[in-house]
Every structure is written in C-alpha cells, then in structure tokens.
From Swiss-Prot:
PROSITE patterns assigned: OLEOSINS
Locus of motif Proline-knot: 61-72
Tissues with expression: Expressed in seeds (at protein level).
InterPro entries: Oleosin (IPR000136)
Superkingdom of origin: Eukaryota
Cystine connections: none
Protein name: Oleosin H2
PANTHER family linked to this entry: OLEOSIN, OLEOSIN 20.3 KDA
Primary localization class, coarse: other
Entry comment, domain topic: The proline-knot motif may be involved in the targeting to oil bodies.
Membrane-related topology note: Multi-pass membrane protein
Compartment(s): Lipid droplet; Membrane
Keywords of the record: Acetylation, Lipid droplet, Membrane, Transmembrane, Transmembrane helix
Length: 144
C-alpha cells in the first residue's frame, strides 16, 4: 500500500522529479564562469542602448534642421550605388554570355566538318536512290 501515489509524502514526490546526482564539476564551472560574463555583457548592452538613445535625442534636431539637404543627398548616394551595382551586374552578364558564345562556336567549329560530311553522304544517298528509282521506272515504261 505504500506504493500507491496518495500514500507518499509530498517531499518524496518532489524528490522523484529531481535528478539523483548533482551537476558535474564541469557544469558548475561553466555556470560560475558564464554567469558573471553574461551579467557584464548585459550591463554593456544596457549602457550602449542608453548612449544610443541619448545620442539620438541630441542628433534628432540636427536631422530635422538639415533634412532638406540630407534626404536628397542620401537619395543621390543610394541611386549612384544602385547604378554602379546594376552596371556591374550587366557587365558580368555580358561577359558570361560572350564566354558561353565563344565556347559554343569552338565546339561547333570542331564538329562542323563532320556534320558537312554526314550531310553530303545523305544527299548522295538520296540522289542515288532517286536516280535508281527513276531508272527503274523508265525501264518499266520501256518494257511493256
């Protein structure tokens, strides 16, 4: 009857969820090392956020005052960068197309004589076949 769940004490139930052995030395060392490091990095992140907000609060009036100059300048720079990138992309596309075309022509030049010989043989065979057929028909007409 002691095995039934309602007969167990609450401390026994809690102990059943806990691991039987404690953390290893390397795990404890990792926590001891990384916890302060994480805290320091979190503090630095907070300081940087605070500095950014203060800097933005100070610089916002300057951005508002100089916005008639800054906005067109930013747009001009953005368009110039876009133009350079587009030009480069088109240049690379053109070079790769020319390279492909040259390789294609080189491959075709090597196989062109073979293709011409094959076409010549087919024409000769076709002409020879037609000549034989015409000769056969003429002999059939002559022999009644």
């Amino acid at each position: 009857m002691a095995d039934e769940p309602h007969d167990q004490r609450p401390t026994d139930v809690i102990k059943s969820y806990l691991p039987e052995k404690g953390p290893s030395t390397s795990q404890v060392l990792a926590v001891v090392t990384l916890f302060p490091l994480g805290a320091v990095l979190l503090c630095l992140a907070g300081l940087i956020l605070t500095g950014t907000i203060i800097g933005l609060a100070v610089a916002t009036p300057l951005f508002v005052i100089f916005s008639p100059i800054l906005v067109p300048a930013a747009l001009t720079i953005a368009l110039a960068v876009t133009g350079f990138l587009t030009s480069g992309a088109f240049g690379i596309t053109a070079l790769s197309s020319i390279s492909w075309l040259l390789n294609y022509v080189r491959r075709m030049r090597g196989s062109l004589p073979e293709q011409l010989d094959h076409a010549r043989r087919r024409v000769q065979e076709t002409v020879g076949q037609k000549t034989r057929e015409a000769g056969q028909r003429s002999q059939d007409v002559i022999r009644p």
